């Protein structure tokens, strides 16, 4: 189906699903003619009464995209966040130009008092090591973490050319940010490559994740659809990833680039990100 470009300034709510807050209310976020806006409405699609103010909604930037054709993701997490309050986690573009891709958690409010208890958290702005032109395909919460799945330009391949890798990123729900100037950035953000390939001496890679699925009855497995690059030999595959294997990678060694012309290599010893409850 083709979309008439003349219709793109209209408001779209399709990039993100509706999230039920309770039996009667929904959280929605839309592009709002390239000016993202979020709101809470009744499940029958009518507005809340004036006395039913919901703190923290109105500005949808970094929560949903400017462009309805962007590949974005979001998940409403009800438990495990700082202060025990619900929060929206999202992966999208925070600027109209798409220069600022972000994994984001909005300000956290106490809905009983309307008071902001915790400020937003996000990936470091304009840092291609964090995110490099990502296309998000999904997000899930499991235990203490929220996981994001996406494909992006592979920064570790830059010295050899340009290619796309698939990723899984993880943040801790309890994350309250770094120190000093990094207080609004994630302190627990990690990402790793997802490898979907036909094994052998010369593996054949399906580098571009297209969709992700986790069974509602099983928090230990993810199933993903991958494809080859659109300019190469066309192919697709379904690969499954066990959560224990994912966590083993996140607990393992990091890669680093010693100089701008060096290869990316594992650091000498493992570094760990510890959640403080």
Where are these predicted regions, by residue range?
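Disulfide-stabilized extracellular ectodomains of secreted/luminal proteins, especially beta-rich
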Residues: 1-277
């Amino acid at each position: 189906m083709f979309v008439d470009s003349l219709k793109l300034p209209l408001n779209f709510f399709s990039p993100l699903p509706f999230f039920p807050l309770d039996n009667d209310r929904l959280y929605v976020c839309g592009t709002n003619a390239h000016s993202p806006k979020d709101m809470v409405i009744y499940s029958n699609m009518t507005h809340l009464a004036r006395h039913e103010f919901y703190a923290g909604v109105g500005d949808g930037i970094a929560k949903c995209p400017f462009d309805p054709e962007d590949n974005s993701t979001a998940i409403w997490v009800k438990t495990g966040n700082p202060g025990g309050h619900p929060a929206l986690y999202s992966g999208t573009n925070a600027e109209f130009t798409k220069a600022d891709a972000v994994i984001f958690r909005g300000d956290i409010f106490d809905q009983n008092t309307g008071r902001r208890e915790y400020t937003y958290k996000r990936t470091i702005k304009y840092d291609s090591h964090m995110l490099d032109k990502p296309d998000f395909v999904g997000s899930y919460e499991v235990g203490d973490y929220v996981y994001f799945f996406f494909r992006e330009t592979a920064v570790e391949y830059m010295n050899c050319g340009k290619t796309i890798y698939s990723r899984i990123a993880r943040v801790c729900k309890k994350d309250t940010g770094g120190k000093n100037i990094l207080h609004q950035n994630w302190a627990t953000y990690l990402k790793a490559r997802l490898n979907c390939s036909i094994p052998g001496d010369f593996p054949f890679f399906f580098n571009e994740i297209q969709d992700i699925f986790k069974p509602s009855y099983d928090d230990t497995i993810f199933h993903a659809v991958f494809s080859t690059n659109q300019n190469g030999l066309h192919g697709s595959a379904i690969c499954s990833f066990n959560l224990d294997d994912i966590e083993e990678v996140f607990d393992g060694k990091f890669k680093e680039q010693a100089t701008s012309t060096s290869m990316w290599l594992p650091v000498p010893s493992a570094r760990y990100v510890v959640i403080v409850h």
